[in-house]
Amino acid sequence: MLKFPCLVLDHDDTVVQSEATINYPFFCYILDQFRPGQKITLQEYTHGCYHTGFAQMCREKYGFTEQEMQDEYLGWQAYIKTHIPEPYPGIREVIHRQKAEGGLVCVVSHSCNENITRDYAAHIGLQPDDIYGWDYPEHQRKPNPYPLLEIMKKYGLKPEQLLVVDDMKPAWEMANKVSVPIAFAGWGRKDYPEITEEMTSLCNYAFADTKDLYNFLFES
């Protein structure tokens, strides 16, 4: 019997290594186009996404208009079509074991569905059961609990039958609102001890490596 019938996985920096190699470099380009002369470090970018979420960071810190938000999104979509991130070692085994045991794998992410399905096809060899990505209206994206409520409704699951696996605080906010347990994907935040410390204290579980998650789910 599975410990959690449904895994709810983040995508960026949980399944694939995309922040430093794809998302941050593109945002530097966009910032130079929209706000010439303004700079952002990788650490500032990470902390902005962690504490406020990407969209709010763009609006509050850089004053992006709604048109600029839309232009950024369209540019990002075009950029990531030719930039495919690598998966974290071991995450494929977690996903395949969950499915082999009859479980569900859903994705709740700020990536768009097209890129998630592409990455799963390229690296995982199967597709998630459901995806709640950036394509959804903003009020239905994490940290709003809408994705979790929809998953529970669709599959007839209770909160304790889901496990969110994510590296960022908005996921904790989402899960906490509906009493769904969450595991910190520490393998995506090894260079950020302050984030690791806070998420470890907030989340129900914390794992430094995908192997630790695998052992917890299937071997313990």
Give each language-model segment a name.
Residues 2-93, 101, 114-115:
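N-terminal helical cap/lid subdomain that shapes the substrate entry/recognition surface
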Residues 90-94, 147-150:
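Well-ordered alpha-helical segments embedded in enzymatic catalytic cores
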Residues 31, 35, 63, 99-102, ...:
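Glycine-centered loop/turn motif at secondary-structure junctions
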